[in-house]
């Protein structure tokens, strides 16, 4: 059984302050152009943004720990048998079986479909060596109502998709550091209870193979941010990015990479993998 983190690994509260990048709403729908990876990979969005300093709380100090249906994210201990995540294409079936065994008991549901693995680093050298993408340093959520439903239809055959869409489904990211602890450019998640719909805006997402949507977010003094200091490869952060249930539980946790001012100058770069999956009920 995979244990939820108790938040006691760090005895010291490592809350910090940093700037996060918020959307400045305009008259036109923003367009996000997904990068192809590599040394020059960077965010490309045709919209205006502002960098706002916020408090980023130490999630390990939360008692009780955060959970998917309240805050929209939760931390778990999870040891993977994958030795080299840069070879994930050759080990997908193995890792996806691990993820299924982890996530289904946590969320419930009848079927889980893993459909994407994205590797990221804040090091140009590492991005170039492995042709991977940049850390996503803008406040966002991966799906809108429309794009979540479209993704189901993209991945399942017509009859199965329409049958699954009649019931609840959830999209979750499983994020983990793949080398040493994630100290440089870690991930921070916003408590879903602190995010108002008036601050969330649909954005077109254009990639080489398809067009979809994601959500960008404008600033609010109500937002409550959390991160888990020094996440290692034996921990995973589950982040809810869509939930079709309309019963008061969290539907998503907006998130972003941020500059960690507590990180030593010589700390190793961030290297991470995020795996996206759908859970059907």
Predicted region positions:
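Basic/polar N-terminal segments that are highly enriched at the extreme N-terminus
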Residues: 1-18, 280-281
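Compositionally biased, intrinsically disordered low-complexity regions
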Residues: 9, 28, 39-40, 250, ...
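Non-heme Fe(II) oxygenase catalytic core, chiefly the N-lobe of the double-stranded beta-helix
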Residues: 14-229, 266
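Catalytic core of Fe(II)/2-oxoglutarate
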Residues: 215-281
């Amino acid at each position: 059984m995979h244990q939820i983190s108790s938040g006691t690994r760090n005895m010291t509260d490592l809350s910090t302050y940093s700037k996060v990048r918020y959307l400045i709403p305009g008259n036109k729908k923003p367009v996000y152009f997904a990068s192809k990876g590599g040394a020059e990979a960077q965010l490309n969005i045709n919209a205006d943004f502002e960098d706002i300093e916020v408090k980023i709380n130490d999630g390990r100090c939360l008692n009780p720990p955060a959970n998917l249906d309240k805050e929209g994210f939760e931390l778990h201990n999870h040891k993977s048998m994958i030795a080299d995540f840069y070879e994930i294409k050759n080990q997908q079936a193995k890792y996806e079986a691990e993820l299924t065994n982890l996530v289904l008991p946590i969320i419930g549901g009848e079927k889980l479909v893993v459909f994407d693995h994205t590797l990221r680093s804040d090091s140009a050298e590492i991005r170039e060596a492995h042709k991977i993408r940049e850390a996503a340093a803008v406040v966002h959520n991966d799906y809108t109502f429309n794009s979540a439903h479209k993704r189901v239809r993209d991945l399942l055959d017509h009859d199965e998709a329409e049958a699954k869409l009649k019931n609840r489904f959830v999209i979750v990211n499983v994020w983990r550091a793949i080398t040493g602890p994630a100290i440089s450019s870690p991930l921070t998640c916003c408590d879903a209870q602190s995010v108002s719909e008036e601050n969330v805006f649909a954005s077109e997402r254009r990639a080489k193979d398809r067009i979809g949507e994601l959500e960008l977010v404008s600033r609010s003094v109500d937002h409550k941010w959390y991160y888990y200091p020094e996440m290692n490869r034996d921990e995973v952060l589950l982040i809810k990015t869509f939930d079709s249930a309309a019963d008061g539980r969290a539907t998503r946790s907006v998130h972003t990479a941020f500059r960690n001012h507590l990180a030593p100058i010589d700390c190793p770069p961030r290297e991470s993998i995020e795996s996206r999956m759908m859970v059907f009920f």
